[in-house]
């Protein structure tokens, strides 16, 4: 909700998992009606779809990130992409300042982090931004030489993208297969402010309690992890 323009923007997906588009609609509180911002914001080209998350910062900038999925199977998730808008979703830009030619597709998307399929890359996690408008993305995936997914942070410092590992987990698991799966960790949440990063998660290795990782310098990636509860929250996600 934009207080200045008194409007609400809603994103919706058309199509199905592995084959769909992302569209944006706007509701005017003054006129009491909906309008379409653009017919297609992210185009799956009838081959894939974007699983997305967004964050609106203090300046009103909309930060949007997503992974591509090639089929309905979660193991076909790949890559982390990024776009941002300064005008409530009408025009979109890369972190470099280059304006997107809409719709955004596989070929013209900005890639914050390149990851292949079968990386145990999770979809629909969380984002934040610092006072300078730099985006931060919380997620998890596994390295090619490991079968253990690790929590990660992906961020842009105003010039280039970086990523760091947050945890040192020991338990392997896979996202492969259909249906609802009982996986040992939750999708993470992230909060950024005053040069500090707070990363909220749940992990069976820590008794499935609510845990928070804290860092003050992502360049050296030293994290202090504290359990916020002394009891299990089962399959809770932040």
Label every model-predicted segment.
Residues 1-12:
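Single conserved hydrophobic/aromatic residue that forms the stacking wall/gate
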Residues 11, 24, 64, 82, ...:
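Hydrophobic strand positions within the blades of repeat-based beta-sheet folds
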Residues 18-26, 72-81, 145-152, 203-215:
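Structural motif
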Residues 27-36, 85-96, 154-163, 170, ...:
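Asp-box/BNR beta-propeller loop motif
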Residues 39-45, 94-119, 163-181, 229-236:
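Surface-exposed loop and turn segments in beta-propeller and other repeat-based domains
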Residues 59-61, 132-135, 194-197:
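Short coil/turn segments that connect the beta-strands within blades of beta-propeller domains
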